[in-house]
Amino acid sequence: GDVTGSDHVVWRMNRLTPYVASPLLYDDTLYHLRHNQNVLVRMDPTTGKLRGELLRLEGIRDFIFASPVGAAGRIYVTGRDGTTVVLKHPSGNEAFENAVLAVNRLEDSFSASPALVDREFYLRGERFLYCLAE
């Protein structure tokens, strides 16, 4: 039923919200992308309060439709321009300084969210399906 105005709605926000990408809950942090601005937001999932500074994803030059994914202490954000930014997942309110570990580019366009399986990273581009592994 309708839970608007009930105790079931713990918190809500109406700014800094994503346009297409779904949020990511990783460890004790909720990540989401600010509406069409390539800015990553970190939040406390229980209170809805921001954690630290917002992070502009400088390496991505187009919109981000894919949802961020996380594994092994890293957060992966893929833009439509084929760029994936790899970030260190900071704990708690630790600063996002020096968070960018790598910026990788493929010559394709990505709207679908990546999939992580075991030690493989799958990306579906407009032209190809990619499997990245060590």
Locate the predicted segments by residue:
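Noncatalytic, solvent-exposed loop/strand surfaces
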Residues: G1-E134
